[in-house]
Amino acid sequence: MAARTRSLVERRRVLMAGVRSHTRFYKALAEEVREFHATKICGTLLTLLSGSLQGRSVFEATRVTLICEVDLGPRRPDCICVFEFANDKTLGGVCVIIELKTCKYISSGDTASKREQRATGMKQLRHSLKLLQSLAPPGDKIVYLCPVLVFVAQRTLRVSRVTRLVPQKVSGNITAVVRMLQSLSTYTVPIEPRTQRARRRRGGAARGSASRPKRSHSGARDPPESAARQLPPADQTPTSTEGGGVLKRIAALFCVPVATKTKPRAASE
């Protein structure tokens, strides 16, 4: 009984690790799609998927859409990345059907577990391909359905193996295909808005600068206010005798006595 309980716990732990790896993969790929639209920079995962674009360049795509956990009824492919080619006269787009398999160690070679995963993944992809062929909305342009099996490491998401099945060609409307797949999606990747990320970075920088003492441009610390406000002692306050000294010298020439003018000292409390 105890051994059976441990086995169930271990299976659940492995399953949850795989689920976490899947969601992290979706997030990483969605981030690359967003950056591609904003900057036309193609990330690692998009570059990998571009090998299924039937000779087209990823930079020819007018739009890239990632749709996760598509419910096709009997099957639910992990994600489908759709590349639209609106400027092409014959090609409407390419749907890359991705089945993801995770492994704890990618350096362990071709183990029995990986062979089983590969056989299962290929079967799942063929099933998903048939379902999509029957569900694709009709149209007058070519749409390629390209199944891809991807092995990644659970922690690093490093891709260790990619297997591409023979693509299938159908006549369809790629815009309608995207709408259909989005309506069947059961998982949406939570993407943090750019403004929120920038606001958090600015807040962290402000908190860091507030904790450090302010320095002047010369690199020295600002003098304390008490030192700036110090006044000389009362007994060292000079008397104003500038005018008296000049008059004394003039009066000495004519032998006329002149009184010295001094300012009264402030009375100390």
Swiss-Prot record:
- Judging by the UniProt lineage, the source's domain of life is Viruses
**Database matches in InterPro entries:** Herpes_UL24 (IPR002580)
User: What is one GO cellular-component annotation here?
Assistant: host cell nucleolus
For this UniProt record, give its keywords in alphabetical order, as a comma-separated list. Host cytoplasm, Host Golgi apparatus, Host nucleus, Virion
Q: Where is this region: Disordered?
A: 191-244
Where is the protein found, in the record's own terms?
A: Virion; Host cytoplasm; Host nucleus, Host nucleolus; Host Golgi apparatus
Predominant localisation class: virion
State what induces this protein: Expressed late in the infection cycle.
Pfam families recorded: Herpes_UL24
Give the UniProt family note: Belongs to the herpesviridae UL24 family.
Q: What does this protein do?
A: May participate in nuclear egress of viral particles. Plays a role in the dispersal of several host nucleolar proteins including NCL/nucleolin and NPM1. Since deletion of host NCL/nucleolin negatively impact on nuclear egress, UL24 supposedly acts on this process through its effect on host nucleoli.
- What protein is this chain from? Protein UL24
Per the UniProt record, the source organism is: Human herpesvirus 1 (strain 17) (HHV-1)
